[in-house]
Curated annotation (Swiss-Prot):
GO terms for biological process: translation. Part of the 30S ribosomal subunit. Contacts proteins S9 and S11. It comes from the Bacteria. GO terms for cellular component: small ribosomal subunit. One of its GO terms (molecular function) is tRNA binding. One of the primary rRNA binding proteins, it binds directly to 16S rRNA where it nucleates assembly of the head domain of the 30S subunit. Is located at the subunit interface close to the decoding center, probably blocks exit of the E-site tRNA. InterPro entries: Ribosomal_uS7, Ribosomal_uS7_bac/org-type, Ribosomal_uS7_CS, Ribosomal_uS7_dom, Ribosomal_uS7_dom_sf. It comes from Nitrosomonas europaea (strain ATCC 19718 / CIP 103999 / KCTC 2705 / NBRC 14298). Keywords: Ribonucleoprotein, Ribosomal protein, RNA-binding, rRNA-binding, tRNA-binding. Belongs to the universal ribosomal protein uS7 family. This is Small ribosomal subunit protein uS7. The keyword Phosphoprotein does not apply. Pfam families: Ribosomal_S7. The keyword Zinc does not apply.
């Protein structure tokens, strides 16, 4: 571990339209090459599509989708006596959100719809209903942790 002082967490301001901090974080996750306005347009477009499709509050659908994607446990490699073991560990809350946002972004990028806002909207809708590629990724991580439960005594 570094011996320098601990780096403070930067405060992220809520997004300008919906005043939601998680949306602002997701804008930063989606942003490429510093083009924040493009990322905001994609997200707001996706939320508009969601509102038209479902008739529900789009921010509510977004938070429901994220909470469905968040992993509880994951595996970490631990070397013991010349062998590598996949040790299941609980995921900290900040990392849970970060992983969920990354998985959501990657799943939306892999979809076949025409524009990114349509891809993101349909992935958000599926994730809020507990299906889709991002949910599949979470289930895969949970399955890995479950199958390696025998090595959970190798704590970090």
């Amino acid at each position: 571990m570094p011996r320098r002082r601990e780096v403070p967490k930067r405060e992220i301001l809520p997004d300008p339209k919906y005043h939601n901090i998680e949306l602002a974080k997701f804008v930063n996750v989606l942003m490429t090459r510093g083009k924040k306005s493009v990322a905001e347009q994609i997200i707001y477009g996706a939320l508009n599509h969601l509102e038209k499709k479902t008739g529900k509050d789009p921010v509510e659908v977004f938070t429901q989708a994220l909470s469905n994607i968040r992993p509880v446990v994951e595996v970490k490699s631990r070397r013991v006596g010349g062998a590598n073991y996949q040790v299941p560990v609980e995921v900290r809350s900040i990392r849970r959100s970060a992983l969920a946002m990354r998985w959501l972004r990657d799943a939306a990028r892999k979809r076949s719809e025409k524009s990114m806002d349509l891809r993101l909207a349909s992935e958000l809708l599926e994730a809020s209903e507990n299906r889709g590629a991002a949910i599949k990724k979470r289930e895969e991580v949970h399955r890995m942790a479950e199958s390696n439960k025998a090595f959970s005594h190798f704590r970090f």
